[in-house]
Swiss-Prot record:
Description of what induces expression: Expressed in the early phase of the viral replicative cycle.
Protein encoded by which gene: OPG079
The protein's name in its UniProt record: Protein OPG079
GO BP terms, alphabetized: chromosome condensation
Location in the cell: Host cytoplasm
Source organism (scientific name): Vaccinia virus (strain Copenhagen) (VACV)
């Protein structure tokens, strides 16, 4: 039987935003700024280029000279409540799973990317002709949904299981999808990369691919304790053995049918 270790959960207040404000260009930029712990300049400018798909523009990021000289990547790090879901409507496709991250902290790269993209559209510069008809005043912005970013491009990503005082375990995410989808929501870090700027009418968003997921090796559950406080309960006794055997995981078939949403999602690009 798995050993249970109880830990008090200490949470810090997180920025919140209304659904309406997150659907405006100014609102999503301000929200991304509010969850950034730094305002250090990272991006010099962004260029959107036409692609083979009419609704998509490729994204080219020019970092500042100091970062470029250090061969810094354009990856973006996020932290937040993370859950991998099965996509019931697409089990026979490569995007049979997707990641939902309720972001609580983000690299300044995120807000500067949004700021640069919508600045380009406002000033009609560094964008393809297909975007010249857009106005930042009338755009419905969809990068965030319910303060979360959805990522269904997982191919080639790595997952790193970490535990204090122990060596981490690094694996390809392809072999971990099933077990990860059975985990409870957990605080995790994700390294993502922007793929395209997507437009459907006046709805727009930036889509991302996952490069790496960094998550606690322990399988945990948040429960209400006898005192009424939330407690973080470890569900594993031997993390490495349980990880290998997929023990200590939630048994329910936690699936999410994106087609059941009233609003048709546009994060599958």
């Amino acid at each position: 039987m798995s050993k249970v270790i109880k830990k008090r959960v200490e949470t810090s207040p997180r920025p919140t935003a209304s659904s309406d404000s997150l659907q405006t260009c100014a609102g999503v930029i301000e929200y991304a700024k509010s969850i950034s712990k730094s305002n250090a300049k990272c991006i010099e400018y962004v260029t959107l280029n036409a692609s083979q798909y009419a609704n998509c523009s490729s994204i080219s990021i020019k970092l500042t000279d100091s970062l470029s000289s250090q061969m810094t990547s354009t990856f973006i790090m996020l932290e937040g409540e993370t859950k991998l879901y099965k996509n019931k409507s697409k089990q026979d496709r490569s995007d049979g799973y997707f990641l939902k991250i309720k972001v609580t902290a983000a690299s300044p790269m995120l807000y500067q990317l949004l700021e640069a993209v919508y600045g380009n559209i406002k000033h009609k510069e560094r964008i393809p002709n297909s975007l010249h008809s857009l106005s930042v005043e009338t755009i419905t912005e969809k990068t965030f949904k319910d303060e979360s970013i959805f990522i269904n491009k997982l191919n080639g990503a790595m997952v790193e299981y970490v535990s204090a005082g122990e060596s981490s375990i690094l694996r390809s995410i392809e072999g971990e999808l099933e077990s990860l989808s059975k985990r409870e929501r957990q605080l995790a870090k994700a390294i993502i990369t922007p793929i395209v700027f997507y437009r459907s009418g006046t709805e727009t968003k930036i889509t991302f691919a996952l490069k790496k997921l960094i998550i606690d090796r322990e399988v945990v559950a948040n429960v209400i304790g006898l005192s009424g406080d939330s407690e973080r309960v470890s569900m594993t006794e031997n993390v490495e053995e349980d990880l290998a055997r997929n023990l200590g995981l939630v048994d329910i078939d936690d699936e999410y049918d994106e087609d059941s949403d009233k609003e048709k999602p546009i994060f599958n690009v």
